[in-house]
Amino acid sequence: MTLAILAVFSVALTLLGFVLPPQGVKRATLLGLALALASLLLTWGKPFAFGPYAVDGVSQVFTLLALLGALWTVGLVRSGRFEFYLLVLYAALGMHLLASTRHLLLMLVALEALSLPLYALATWRRGQGLEAALKYFLLGALAAAFFLYGAALFYGATGSLVLGAPGEGPLYALALGLLLVGLGFKAALAPFHFWTPDVYQGSPTPVVLFMATSVKAAAFAALLRVAAPPEALALLVALSVVVGNLAALAQKEAKRLLAYSSIAHAGYMALALYTGNAQALGFYLLTYVLATGLAFAVLSQISPDRVPLEALRGLYRKDPLLGLAFLVAMLSLLGLPPLAGFWGKYLAFAEAARAGAWGVLVLALVTSAVSAYYYLGLGLAVFARPEETPFRPGPPWARAAVVAAGVLLLALGLLPGLVLPALAAGG
């Protein structure tokens, strides 16, 4: 049902976009995404399969997160061109497909269905972001080639294109490694992260919100289905948490800093992936989507483009609501109680300890402590003496979304049991 709704709205708005005003297309896109989300919730815990397309618990949890990010993105954007909303809708369709299949050919189609709109969205404001978007496109094409080659080797090793087919030997291991490279690019795992800082810095802030939340959720849904070698996952965890956190320390622009932060968080998610616990990964992603979405929603009200760190100074004095919301987002990303980010990291780290992955666990703990320097620096900057920069508060609905995300982060921090049973039923 979710697939049908997204497909119908995508095709219908492609045809009607030329006659409807842009705001009409935006409202219709929001309606389509909301209906897709409602259908997902109404069928929660009820598996469905049709050929290679299969809705299961993993699909439902990660599609939910992707749709939340898509709704937030469309709500924040004020574009005079209807194509923007169509691109988000088509990307959301690709994300749902990616999360809802084990078949490598359909997975490849889904990857391209979500990637092509993202390349266009990254170049939406031409000029400073064009070079970064070109890098994103070229590296994305290379990652797709790795994935395709991995699928071919997987078929050669197992005689099947369905993930989970039994296999062994060096050809099978190489196939899984190449699939991991292709999906690791979308998840922004180091060392496949080189596009992330430039694209985040050069793209419009709502587009960055979409990339940092929805795309990451869909990528990890696919990664969860790939039985990647534990040694390879451990290496990706180590590289991501070290590169992401250390590089973030030297940044002077907020979106670029959060890009490196997202690389580090991809490493923590990969730690949950390493243990094979879908519930821990799903909860971590939920808290990450809420906190990261909240941070970028605040940044989008400061500037739709680049946001130097100085622009955050004194935000609380200019707008107490946005200042407090940004502080909540930073503290949740850091993983401090009583916010939801604490339980996300706790579940991932506890599962790693239970699995005996002490090496990567210690590294994750140390780098998480290092991240306190820049998260607290960003969060407390909002209380400093304000810079003399123009500031115009966003519309009421955007502020309401900020409040809702902040309240959810606090509520899930105090009562994580509100969603853990549902995630267990889904995952």
From Swiss-Prot:
Molecular function per GO: NADH dehydrogenase (ubiquinone) activity; NADH:ubiquinone reductase (non-electrogenic) activity; quinone binding
Q: What is its EC number?
A: 7.1.1.-
Asked if the Swiss-Prot or TrEMBL record annotates the protein with the keyword NAD, the reply is yes
Presence of keyword Cytoplasm = no
Where found in the cell?
Cell inner membrane
| Bilayer topology annotation | Multi-pass membrane protein
Any one Gene Ontology cellular component term annotated for this protein: plasma membrane
Transmembrane stretches, start-end: 1-21, 30-50, 57-77, 79-99, 104-124, 137-157, 172-192, 204-224, 230-250, 257-277, 280-300, 322-342, 360-380, 400-420
Highest taxon of the source? Bacteria
Q: State the top-level EC class.
A: translocase
**What does the UniProt keyword field contain?**
Cell inner membrane, Cell membrane, Membrane, NAD, Quinone, Translocase, Transmembrane, Transmembrane helix, Transport
> Its Gene Ontology biological processes?
ATP synthesis coupled electron transport
Reaction equation(s) it catalyzes: a quinone + NADH + 5 H(+)(in) = a quinol + NAD(+) + 4 H(+)(out)
Task of the protein: NDH-1 shuttles electrons from NADH, via FMN and iron-sulfur (Fe-S) centers, to quinones in the respiratory chain. The immediate electron acceptor for the enzyme in this species is menaquinone. Couples the redox reaction to proton translocation (for every two electrons transferred, four hydrogen ions are translocated across the cytoplasmic membrane), and thus conserves the redox energy in a proton gradient required for the synthesis of ATP.
What assembly does the database describe for this protein? NDH-1 is composed of 15 different subunits, Nqo1 to Nqo15. The complex has a L-shaped structure, with the hydrophobic arm (subunits Nqo7, Nqo8 and Nqo10 to Nqo14) embedded in the membrane and the hydrophilic peripheral arm (subunits Nqo1 to Nqo6, Nqo9 and Nqo15) protruding into the bacterial cytoplasm. The hydrophilic domain contains all the redox centers.
Family, similarity comment: Belongs to the complex I subunit 2 family.
Q: What is this protein called?
A: NADH-quinone oxidoreductase subunit 14
Q: State the organism of origin.
A: Thermus thermophilus (strain ATCC 27634 / DSM 579 / HB8)
Q: Which gene specifies this protein's sequence?
A: nqo14
